[in-house]
């Protein structure tokens, strides 16, 4: 048995549960405890899990709808050293779970991330999404598990800020105490895990595993309209990162030697330019006139592309500069 708790968040998840339970069975006996957090399902989700999920320390709890609030509620129930968020439809192998926990222990990590294989609803393998974890593995040439330096985590989170550094939570393990100290934010719509990575990139210990042993199911979101809309009024990633960096420099998590202020300001300048251009282009696309016929839209699209290219250039400078 591993020092691992499992949180299974559900909300009218019945279409994905047969596949999900089938994926859990080969390794669930390794877990010390299992907590199902259901958000008032009306489609038989809880009944199905009660009938088909077996574990000596299985508990059911309920929480009002809200993706990350439900995650936090489930994590609060876990007493094991580590936790995996087994989101419905996503799977991981027995060997993979053991590997993630082993790396967390051996490298003293707060979170260990890995890249899943992407599948559609029919089970067919799909092309990779360009997630931050893939960028980390490719850019650093990761061939075996390694722990990221805090400045590396900050750079990858910054340059890939439109996605979550954690990738798929079902492909990772987290130190439970760390998630209780730094819960997922609930005011960023469906991007709470991405913003969590930005907020805490430098103050948690990240481990990276290059092997693949999990799957991520590509399916429509189950988020409520209110949850989706909350992102529209949330702070942007550049504002979140500026506030976080101020705190990291005060605490010493990031120093002038590891990430010079001038280089960071260049990154922030281009990140802000990227989000300004993205916001303008998104507005162009909402107009009745097709954006392709709008010269302003083309200019904003080019600005966005140029800003993204500059962020990639600065990423290479930051990662591979020669430290004094």
Pin down the residues of each PLM region:
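Conserved donor NDP-sugar-binding/catalytic core segment of glycosyltransferases
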Residues: 97-138
